[in-house]
Regions:
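Short hydrophobic alpha-helical runs that function as membrane-insertion/retention elements
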Residues: 242-246, 300-302, 367-368
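Nucleotide/pyrophosphate-binding catalytic subdomain
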Residues: 3-290
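Acidic/polar loop patches that form or flank catalytic/metal-binding clefts of enzymes
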Residues: 286, 297-304
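Terminal amphipathic helices with adjacent charged low-complexity linkers/tails
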Residues: 57-72, 253, 302, 307-319, ...
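A conserved regulatory-domain signal marking ACT and ACT-like small-molecule sensing domains
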Residues: 310-381
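Conserved dinucleotide-binding and phosphotransfer motif residues
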Residues: 159, 296, 362
Length: 381
C-alpha cells in the first residue's frame, strides 16, 4: 500500500511539475564512428536551443557483441581475447583521433584506458577461474556504453558546452527476480530526480544506456533494448516532455521496406498501434523497454540520425485520426509452426502445460496458440 501511495504521489507531482527536459537516445549505428558522432553532436546542439537535454547512448556498433566474445574466449583460456581487446581499444583511439581536437585527445585516451584497464583485469580473473559468471559478463558488457559516452562528453566539452556525464550504474537500481535483473523503478526515479536537482545549471547530461547496478553495487545490465529502457526511465524520472529515439531508419514504416519498396513512414501513431506493430516484427522499438513512458503518457519521437530534417514518427496517446483504415503491416521472420495432432491428447490434463514448459526450458518464446474445440489438434508458433 505504501508503494502504491508513493507511486500515486509521484504521478501527481509529474502532472503538476512543468517540464523543461527532453531525453534523446542514440543507438549503436548512430555513434559507430567519428562522422556519425558528429551528426549526433549537431542534433544535440540544436536540441539544446529548445530545452535542457539528457542524452542516452548505446555502445558503438558491434562493440557489445565483441565484448561478449571477449568474455567467452577468456573463459576458454583462449588468448585470442587479448587480440580482440587490443582491436577494440584501437577502434576507440581512431574515433578519438578523428573526432577531437589535438589538445583534448590525451584526456579522452586516458578515460578510454581506464575502462580498458578494468576490462583487462576482469578478463584476467575470468581466465584464471576458467568461468564466465553472469556478474563478470555484465561487468564486461558495461564497458561499451562507458567508452562511447565518455568520448561524446569530451567532444561537447571541447566545444565549450558544459556537458555532465552521469554514471547510470549509480542511478538505475536493479534487483534479481527468478534469475532476471528487474529495475526498482521507485528507487531509480528518486535517484534520477535527486541527481538532476544537484546540477540545476547544467543544460546537457550524457548517460550510458543499458547498464545499472544492484543494491550491492555490482554492475548489472538491462537486456535486449536496454538503452531504450534507460532512456525511458530517465524520461519518466526527469519529467521529460518528450523521448526522442534516434536510429538509422526514418521512423516506423507502413511495412518492411526491404519487402515492400513503396513503404512509407507513419507520421503519427498511437502507443497501442505502435506496440502491436513492434510485437509482430517492427523492430524500431522494443515494447517492454518503452512501457515506462507509455504509462506516463510521454510522447515518443522516432527519428533518423542521418536525415534529421525528416519528420519521423510521433508515438502518442491520442494521435490525429489517420485517413487510412490500415496503419501498417508487420511481419515476423524465422518463425516455426508446431502442430500436434492425435486422439491421445483428448482429455489429458496438463498436456498443453507440458509442451509450453518444454519450449520454455529451451528458451523458445510462444507468440501464437490455436486449438480446435475437439482438443484433437493444437498449433503453436
Amino acid at each position: 500500500n505504501q508503494v502504491r501511495r508513493s507511486e500515486l504521489v509521484r504521478k501527481t507531482m509529474r502532472r503538476d511539475k512543468k517540464s523543461h527536459m527532453q531525453v534523446l537516445k542514440f543507438g549503436g549505428t548512430s555513434v559507430a564512428n567519428a562522422k556519425n558522432i558528429t551528426n549526433v553532436v549537431e542534433i544535440v546542439t540544436k536540441a539544446l536551443e529548445r530545452d535542457r537535454t539528457l542524452v542516452v547512448s548505446s555502445a558503438i556498433s558491434g562493440c557489445t557483441d565483441k565484448l561478449i566474445s571477449i568474455g567467452n574466449l577468456a573463459a576458454q583460456r583462449n588468448d585470442e581475447y587479448k587480440v580482440l581487446i587490443d582491436d577494440l581499444q584501437q577502434k576507440h583511439y581512431e574515433i578519438i583521433s578523428d573526432l577531437l581536437p589535438a589538445e583534448r585527445q590525451p584526456e579522452a585516451r586516458a578515460k578510454v584506458d581506464e575502462v580498458f584497464d578494468s576490462l583487462k583485469a576482469i578478463t584476467l580473473g575470468v581466465t584464471l577461474l576458467g568461468e564466465l559468471s553472469l556478474t563478470s559478463l555484465d561487468a564486461i558488457q558495461s564497458c561499451g556504453e562507458l567508452l562511447s559516452t565518455k568520448i561524446i562528453t569530451i567532444k561537447f566539452l571541447s566545444m565549450g558546452i558544459s556537458a555532465k556525464w552521469l554514471d547510470s550504474r549509480e542511478i538505475v537500481k536493479t534487483r534479481c527476480e527468478n534469475g532476471t535483473n528487474v529495475v526498482d523503478t521507485s528507487r531509480t526515479y528518486a535517484n534520477i530526480e535527486s541527481v538532476l536537482d544537484k546540477y540545476p545549471q547544467n543544460q546537457l547530461f550524457i548517460v550510458p544506456g543499458f547498464i545499472a547496478s544492484d543494491f550491492q553495487g555490482r554492475t548489472t545490465t538491462l537486456g535486449r533494448g536496454g538503452s531504450d529502457y534507460t532512456a525511458s526511465l530517465f524520461a519518466v524520472g526527469s519529467h521529460a516532455r518528450v523521448l526522442e529515439i534516434w536510429t538509422d531508419v526514418p521512423g516506423m514504416m507502413t511495412s518492411n521496406p526491404k519487402i515492400v519498396p513503396s513503404a512509407r513512414t507513419i507520421p503519427h501513431i498511437s502507443y497501442r498501434a505502435a506496440l502491436e506493430l513492434s510485437h509482430f516484427g517492427a523492430k524500431v522499438i522494443y515494447p517492454p523497454t518503452i512501457q515506462p513512458v507509455v504509462s506516463e503518457g510521454i510522447p515518443i519521437y522516432v527519428k533518423d540520425t542521418f536525415h534529421p530534417e525528416a519528420h519521423g514518427t510521433l508515438i502518442e496517446k491520442n494521435p490525429p485520426r489517420a485517413k487510412e483504415k490500415v496503419i501498417g503491416i508487420s511481419n515476423s521472420d524465422n518463425i516455426a509452426l508446431i502442430s500436434l495432432e492425435g486422439s491421445g491428447m483428448v482429455g489429458i490434463p496438463g498436456f498443453s502445460s507440458r509442451l509450453f514448459d518444454t519450449l520454455s526450458r529451451n528458451d523458445t518464446n510462444i507468440i501464437l496458440i490455436t486449438q480446435a474445440s475437439s482438443v484433437h489438434t493444437m498449433c503453436s508458433a
